From Swiss-Prot:
PANTHER family recorded: DIAMINOPIMELATE EPIMERASE, DIAMINOPIMELATE EPIMERASE, CHLOROPLASTIC
InterPro entries referenced in this protein's UniProt entry, alphabetically: DAP_epimerase_AS, DAP_epimerase_DapF
Protein name as it appears in the record: Diaminopimelate epimerase
Binding site for substrate: 11, 62, 72-73, 160, 193, 211-212, 221-222
Reaction(s) the record says it catalyses: (2S,6S)-2,6-diaminopimelate = meso-2,6-diaminopimelate
Annotated localization: Cytoplasm
Role, per record: Catalyzes the stereoinversion of LL-2,6-diaminopimelate (L,L-DAP) to meso-diaminopimelate (meso-DAP), a precursor of L-lysine.
Pfam families given in the database record: DAP_epimerase
Amino acid sequence: MKFTKMHGLGNDYIYVDAISQKIENPNEISRFVSDRHFGIGSDGLVLILPSDLADFKMRMFNSDGSEAEMCGNAIRCVGKFVYDKKMTDKSTITIETLAGIKVLEMTIENDKVVLVKVDMGEPILKAETIPVLSEKHPVIDEEITAKDYCYNFTCVSIGNPHAITYIENVEEFPLEKIGPLFEIHEKFPRKTNVEFVELIDDSTVKMRVWERGAGETLACGTGACAVLVASVLKGYVGRKATVKLLGGDLTIEWNESDNHIYMTGPATTVFEGEIDI
């Protein structure tokens, strides 16, 4: 299997052109290639496929083999993958995902993609669609307790579920201990991604994320979008802000005119190779 390892702010995946090669058992392949000791090492696997609805289709799998609806960092890399490999000559493309069709605008320098702006669509705020078991709409400050820990979560879906809460110091927060307790909490029928956020100022927030099916990652694009939406709903920031993640910064905007969220950030190729599967 020919592959390209890429990352968006350190959120790394193995990217495979599944148009020119047939890929079977992607769940198993993702578990294998993601292993950082016995495989290639990544947060998961991304397949680029043909689409009847868009320019391309992406399917993505977490390191535990589960399939995810969308990943903001991964979709930026898909844009770079198809442009840099001359699978398209367009700088604006559409990608079909399980979370709908996304539009990518790519910034090109020296015939390579350096930045990608993604129209992530409208945020989902309805409890049963996120999904989260709550009577609130929107779900702001839902008190949830797991073991001895209690937080007020604001819940948003960006095609995948997110639960966001605010703390004073994200760097010292024991995420690996507390994150998984809420990821699998019974309030979330399909589990959830969990974001812990520190407010810097009215246009900057800092976050760490415990991703559903992957654990802590250096960055989560949909998580950054969800954090911006939650922070606007709570009156903490304006509609455009910098979201600081462990792997770097993303610019997120929640546009008032079309209600869409726009995410802008880098996409980086690490190396290419072949592996027996």
